[in-house]
């Protein structure tokens, strides 16, 4: 299902004043793109993106006010369609009577703000991009470890929440437990958050549900985090060969983004929190251009080439 935002949400978010068209506040906004309809006001009606929120600033209104009333009414009627989610007048300018009349007849929300046009456009676009971003929900835990968003996944009961608790005790920050809502806010950018119902909560078998912020303080949690690394916990399988060098980098596709993926086998005696902590630090090192596995492979190849028997 395609995400959508109602015009009423824009009004509330940016404290906009409603001039007319309150009955149309339920209209959906399906794109983050906005429109400054200068060509429509000039009389060119082809390719008018009526489904976008329309922004009228100083340039558009100055031109519009120089038209005859009949021309104003004609072009205002083109602006106001059944699918237009709203028309926003910026900089606190007076709303032309022709636009008020057309918006009132078609129930198009006519809004005003005192903000500058460019600033308002930028803020609304950023808000819509976040709200309309492709979204999915995944089972797991998201923790901020040294600034790296690590998504811990695995079968139920494998120890994800317990590992997250140990990480929080070691000074890292919990974002979400059990269910992580993930939005793709841009190319290659995934941001995870917790559903409001379970925000800051951890479920520990044998204890129950605990409030991490209450127990460990506000510094132990955060509301959202970009996902940079996925660690999959699985019960150790003796028949399976696990990566012992780290040359091959697997990835996991979430929505349309490929994220570095590590499989961490679980068995008694392995400190998962420390292992995941080191995985996050190693990820940061790789981003800084330091790849220990590749350096080792290079040294090994050089030693073999030199016939070094001291291996």
Curated annotation (Swiss-Prot):
Protein name: HPr kinase/phosphorylase
Function of the protein: Catalyzes the ATP- as well as the pyrophosphate-dependent phosphorylation of a specific serine residue in HPr, a phosphocarrier protein of the phosphoenolpyruvate-dependent sugar phosphotransferase system (PTS). HprK/P also catalyzes the pyrophosphate-producing, inorganic phosphate-dependent dephosphorylation (phosphorolysis) of seryl-phosphorylated HPr (P-Ser-HPr).
Record InterPro entries: HPr(Ser)_kin/Pase, Hpr_kin/Pase_C, Hpr_kin/Pase_Hpr_N, P-loop_NTPase, Ser_kin/Pase_Hpr-like_N_sf
Subunit structure: Homohexamer.
Residues covered by region (Important for the catalytic mechanism of dephosphorylation): 265-270
Family affiliation: Belongs to the HPrK/P family.
Taxonomy of the source species: Bacteria, Bacillati, Bacillota, Bacilli, Bacillales
Further facts: Both phosphorylation and phosphorolysis are carried out by the same active site and suggest a common mechanism for both reactions.
UniProt remark on domains: The Walker A ATP-binding motif also binds Pi and PPi.
Stretches the record annotates as Important for the catalytic mechanism of both phosphorylation and dephosphorylation: 202-211
Cofactors that this protein relies on: Mg(2+)
PANTHER family in the cross-refs: HPR KINASE_PHOSPHORYLASE (PTHR30305:SF1), PROTEIN YJDM-RELATED (PTHR30305)
Catalytic activity: [HPr protein]-L-serine + ATP = [HPr protein]-O-phospho-L-serine + ADP + H(+); [HPr protein]-O-phospho-L-serine + phosphate + H(+) = [HPr protein]-L-serine + diphosphate
Active site (catalytic residues): 139, 160, 178, 244
Keywords per UniProt: ATP-binding, Carbohydrate metabolism, Kinase, Magnesium, Metal-binding, Multifunctional enzyme, Nucleotide-binding, Serine/threonine-protein kinase, Transferase
Species per Swiss-Prot/TrEMBL record: Exiguobacterium sibiricum (strain DSM 17290 / CCUG 55495 / CIP 109462 / JCM 13490 / 255-15)
Annotated GO MF terms: ATP binding; magnesium ion binding; phosphorelay sensor kinase activity; protein serine/threonine kinase activity; protein serine/threonine/tyrosine kinase activity
Binding positions (ATP): 154-161
Sequence positions that bind Mg(2+): 161, 203
